[in-house]
Amino acid sequence: MIPKEQKEPVMAVPGDLAEPVPSLDLGKKLSVPQDLMIEELSLRNNRGSLLFQKRQRRVQKFTFELSESLQAILASSARGKVAGRAAQATVPNGLEEQNHHSETHVFQGSPGDPGITHLGAAGTGSVRSPSALAPGYAEPLKGVPPEKFNHTAIPKGYRCPWQEFTSYQDYSSGSRSHTPIPRDYRNFNKTPVPFGGPHVREAIFHAGTPFVPESFSGLELLRLRPNFNRVAQGWVRKLPESEEL
């Protein structure tokens, strides 16, 4: 059992650790690979970094990150354009004037959507939320006829384009089964020949001695086949047996 005197120093250690530890400013640590990569890509004297920066500018050109103030400016300019078009809708035509008015079609959203605001007759209204730009896509469209290209046309049969030409007399397949060969036709198909030409073998044999190939049967070929099997032979000479012995 540990005596009470030894427990007191041990309980005083957590109190010492709770005090603020003095810290030193040792500067920047070693750069990690990601920091080095970003630093190299920001240089102006490297061909790879220049290509990366050019690509970043091209990406930023087609990436629109509009702030709230810019969205309000665009919305006000859009309302001004709608009002201008409504004012220019009255066009004189000959002796009488025909009045044309522009209509702004706004899709009806869900009844509890606070982001949808309907435009008035003069085109005034607040900016709608991005979720209310196309409310028709939230549910299937109704009353819209199906598009024609969605139906695949399956042909009932196949009609060969050469059918009308093969019906003529010139294209009849029964009259000429093969192409006629002319008299001066030469066949250039190559066949294996011995070295020196095809007439070397004929020069070996004389004209008076016709060459007759020998007919070897299977058993004759097996008899003439050399045997390489070896049998152990002793020092005693093998003598043929005779009646005298």
Swiss-Prot record:
<keyword id="KW-0963">Cytoplasm</keyword>
<keyword id="KW-0597">Phosphoprotein</keyword>
<dbReference type="InterPro" id="IPR008438">
    <property type="entry name" value="MYOZ"/>
</dbReference>
<feature type="region of interest" description="Binding to FLNC">
    <location>
        <begin position="67"/>
        <end position="108"/>
    </location>
</feature>
<dbReference type="Pfam" id="PF05556">
    <property type="entry name" value="Calsarcin"/>
</dbReference>
<comment type="subunit">
    <text>Interacts with ACTN2, LDB3, FLNC, PPP3CA and TCAP.</text>
</comment>
<feature type="region of interest" description="Binding to ACTN2">
    <location>
        <begin position="180"/>
        <end position="201"/>
    </location>
</feature>
<dbReference type="GO" id="GO:0030018">
    <property type="term" value="C:Z disc"/>
</dbReference>
<feature type="region of interest" description="Binding to ACTN2, PPP3CA and TCAP">
    <location>
        <begin position="50"/>
        <end position="67"/>
    </location>
</feature>
<comment type="similarity">
    <text>Belongs to the myozenin family.</text>
</comment>
<comment type="function">
    <text>Myozenins may serve as intracellular binding proteins involved in linking Z line proteins such as alpha-actinin, gamma-filamin, TCAP/telethonin, LDB3/ZASP and localizing calcineurin signaling to the sarcomere. Plays an important role in the modulation of calcineurin signaling. May play a role in myofibrillogenesis.</text>
</comment>
<feature type="modified residue" description="Phosphoserine">
    <location>
        <position position="31"/>
    </location>
</feature>
<protein>
    <recommendedName>
        <fullName>Myozenin-3</fullName>
    </recommendedName>
</protein>
<feature type="region of interest" description="Disordered">
    <location>
        <begin position="93"/>
        <end position="134"/>
    </location>
</feature>
